[in-house]
Amino acid sequence: KGYIMKKLTLTSLMAVFAVSAANAAAINDNPLYRPDQGKFYSMTEVASNSKATTSWAAAEEFGYGITDKLAIAVATSVNETDWFDSSDWDTMGLGLSYRVMDMNGWMVDLTGSYGVGPVMPYKGSFLDKDLTDYQWSIGAQVGKTMGNLTLAGHVAMDYVNSESFNWNDDGWHTVRLGADAFLTLNDNWALVGGVEYTGTTDDKMFGKVKVENAGTWTGTVGVNYNFCENSFVGAYVGRAMSHKAAGEWSTDAGFAFGGKFGIQF
């Protein structure tokens, strides 16, 4: 169990509803991006790892600006190994984001989401009762744009359990803390980067397996190219460092790499 937390840790670059949202007219992978009222957007991402290049994951987030402050989105992810020798439908989620402040370059967003995973595990059934977990998340982000540089920090709490509404059970709790940067080089090119820590607040996970402050640091850097204000393409690399017990940190083998495409209309 704890599938969603583990999958989002292992493929954090593909995380459904990472707590990033910007009120820029252009879609450009700025961590503060938010669609204007009446605008749709799509973010498509593919990723792999240098130590497992026969395995690929893909994610899609499709959203809509209900107002200039409120946006809704659905997201899903899938993965495959050895040219679809094995594959599964990982996650499906629904999220809301609300901008509570936009003043003097400062922006504050509140987010909430609900997700399930795996939706269709390999050799399993749809929403498999023995494998599928359900995740509720709330979060906040604070960011500021200073000329060509945007900086943003976020915090989020996740609650994962074996059913959607069995909140009386212990479940599995995680916290995510992170920071992102976006540097505009010119009208077309931009550099992006970010770090995030994902850790559990529990000493036991599903099945009563004991853990001690288990968590993962991930870091990413990338470059984006804007075709116009309504579309961009980007490439990135990332590395993770994790621990299973206090004081026992190790850098994960290999590095993540992938590409991203965004469009609004």
What is the predicted role of each segment?
Residues T54-A58, S86-M92, D130-W136, N161, ...:
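Residues that define the transmembrane beta-barrel architecture of outer-membrane proteins
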Residues Y64, Y98-V100, V142-M146, A181-L183, ...:
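Residue-level signature of outer-membrane beta-barrel architecture
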Residues L8-E45, N49, D187, E229:
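Outer-membrane beta-barrel biogenesis signature
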Residues V46-S50, T76-D82, V100, Y114-M120, ...:
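Transmembrane beta-strands of outer-membrane beta-barrel pores
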Residues F40-Y41, D68-V74, M103-V108, N148-G153, ...:
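Repeated loop/turn-to-beta-strand initiation elements of outer-membrane beta-barrel proteins
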Residues E60, L94-L96, I138-A140, L177-A179, ...:
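Membrane-embedded beta-strands of outer-membrane beta-barrel proteins
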